[in-house]
Each structure stands twice: as structure tokens, then as C-alpha cells.
């Protein structure tokens, strides 16, 4: 939509106090928080025998702790608004592949954590969904999108999905949504 008010905030999702401050700034500006999208993520890919512990820790801290911190910092505001929480996991949260032990571990964790949080927060009329996309065109992991990425899910497709989910009658909760490209590239 157009004509809305935006409050740009830069935060480090690995720092809980940054997220508490951001949520406080949102409440101060808008009076409430209706939707949280926990979407920060990084990827380090290497076989386990080559994975550097510092890379593992950075990935888990961003992908798992960042989701937890985001939700924890905002949950009281979302209780008041009976809001909606979206976490962005991945198909890598239920499927595994070589060189992805850290990434798979983080996305399995996000998927499981989100489903448990959904059960915890339903009693407050907070809806919680995890979105599990497959290949998305993005700058993830240093990639520069090109025309060859046209077959992939586009970021705006995920945005449209979230808007559609917000429109569903609150009595219905799509708790885990897998999304794939309709037509993968030919071999």
C-alpha cells in the first residue's frame, strides 16, 4: 500500500537490547505493534570438518537467537494487539543437504521453535506462522541476482504471501507454510 508511515530502524538481531529498544520505538511512534516478521538470516556453508566454530556461532546467533530475541522483545506488545508473528525459516528447516550442517541446524531450530511458540501464544490470540521458502532471488550469502534467477521466488512474492495470510479469518491459522518455485530451471 502507499501513503503509510515508515519508521526505519537499524538493529543487530544478535543483541536483545537492540530489539527491546526497537520495539519501544515502534510503540512510542505508533502506539502498538500488530505484526512482527523475524526474517534476519545468514548462511555459512561448509562440510562439518571444515566449518569454523566462529562461523557456526555467528550463524546460530543470527538465525536462531535473532528470531528468539525478536519475538521475546515484542511479545508483550503483541499480546496487547492480538498480533501476528511470522518467522522466515526455509525448506532447509525440514530437508537437509551437504555442506549445510550449520544452516540446516538453524532452520530446523527456527521451524521447531516457531511451532512451539505458536502453541504457547495461541491462548493470547496471537497468531504465529513460519514461512518456509525454497529458492528466493536475493542478495543472501553474497549473491547478486541476475536474469538467471527469474525462475526463483521473488522477495515480493513472500511479501504478498504474508499480506494474504494476514487477511485470513483469525479462526484459521496456517502455522507452517512451505513455498517453492513453481517451475525450477531445466537441467
Model regions and ranges:
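The beta1-alpha1 cofactor-binding region of Rossmann-like NAD(H)/NADP(H)-dependent oxidoreductases
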Residues: 10-21, 53
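C-terminal helical subdomain
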Residues: 126, 130-131, 138, 147-187
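Residue(s) in the substrate-gating loop at a strand-loop-helix junction
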Residues: 90
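Active-site loop immediately N-terminal to the catalytic Tyr-X3-Lys motif
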Residues: 49, 95-101
